[in-house]
Amino acid sequence: SYPGFLTRLKTKHPAITTKEKKLCAYLRLGLSSKEISGLQNIAPQSVETARVRLRKKLKISGKIRLSAYLHQV
């Protein structure tokens, strides 16, 4: 569905973990935190925390939505 997305993401952000790549893939597909939490079998708040940490790690400014950034990768 998104050929090369994870490869481009890993190239742009080499320190990204497997868990973070999975979260990025779910966000790129347009899934909500609640949907992701169901797939990962974790609490929705845990997904929100992971999103905040991911934003910091990828150095995404507060003006840009995480999902919008991932669509540009």
Predicted segments with their positions:
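Cytosolic nucleotide-binding catalytic cores of signal-transduction proteins
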Residues: 2-73
